[in-house]
Design a protein with these regions (language model features):
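Charged, low-complexity, helix/coiled-coil-prone segments
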Residues: 1-3, 23-26, 36, 69
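Short amphipathic alpha-helix segments
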Residues: 2-17
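Short, non-transmembrane amphipathic alpha-helical segments
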Residues: 10-14, 45-63
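Short edge beta-strands and adjacent turn/loop segments
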Residues: 15-35
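Short, internal active-site loops enriched in acidic
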Residues: 29-32, 40-41, 72-75
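A short interface-forming secondary-structure element
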Residues: 35-49
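A short amphipathic beta-strand at an alpha->beta junction
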Residues: 59-80
Length: 80
């Protein structure tokens, strides 16, 4: 799978878990990307749960797609 396809897959997973999100993607290399997700606080755990296994599966394939979930109403306080 290409990095672009992996990013698209994770974005669809995020949107399925929480429709009211803002997603920002930064490609770090041909095999690595960082996805920042700004979501309502009530949806943060659902996004983390939904993306955990797909991200692990991508890592096994050699793609490092990191997902960081932030409270869209207070992004600085919830950085993890």
């Amino acid at each position: 799978m290409s990095l672009d396809a992996a990013i698209k897959q994770i974005q669809l997973t995020i949107k399925a878990a929480s429709a009211g999100t803002e997603i920002k993607v930064v490609k770090i290399s041909d095999e690595e990307a960082r996805i920042s997700v700004y979501a309502p606080a009530d949806n943060m755990q659902a996004i983390k749960d939904a993306t955990f296994q797909p991200v692990m599966d991508l890592l096994i394939e050699g793609l490092d797609v990191q997902v960081f979930v932030y409270d869209k109403d207070n992004p600085v306080a919830t950085a993890e």
